[in-house]
Amino acid sequence: MKKLILVVSPPACGKTFVSMELSKRLENIVYLDKDTLIPLSKVIFEVAGEEYNRSSDFFEKYIRDKEYEVILDLAYDALKYAELVLINAPFTREIKSKSYIDGLRKKLEEEYNAKLVIIWVETSPETCHQRMIARNSDRDTWKLANWDEYISKVDFNIPEHLLEGKHKDDLLIFHNSSEEEFEQSMKEITPVLHK
């Protein structure tokens, strides 16, 4: 059965690195990264005369949901041609909604004969902070300048409804706070995705 793999977590947990490394080890896979849409989003900020801030009300109201809509549409198209499609994106709000995830599962099964697999990248908040500093990305400027306010709103807990999956590979937890955890998780998760 085809699979749509969502690699999710709060920002700077290592989604991109994990996603890229998994994609290298899997066959017949399409890799999609929501960050690819950032240049288009920057133009929207510019045209609207708004300061570029991915934590702003403007972003939340006009851009955020459209980015997810577009990346999912690309994934649906890719499922017509590939066995595995992997999306690297936080899905911060969506992943907490049981009805959203159930609806996505149903759509994938009915329209694409595909299964949803969620990989939760689990990383300590301290590690995320250090990674955010190291990557030095403009998308993190506000977060780093307002770290205490930002981190107080980030939920690092796996949503309860995801822990109730019917199948072993509905939810895979990728531990990623150290190189040792990364290697162990890679060894455990890659074979499950091949099935």
What annotation goes with each model-predicted range?
Residues 16:
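Walker A/P-loop
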Residues 13:
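ATP-binding Walker
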Residues 62-112:
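Glycine-rich phosphate-binding loop used to anchor ATP phosphates in small-molecule kinases
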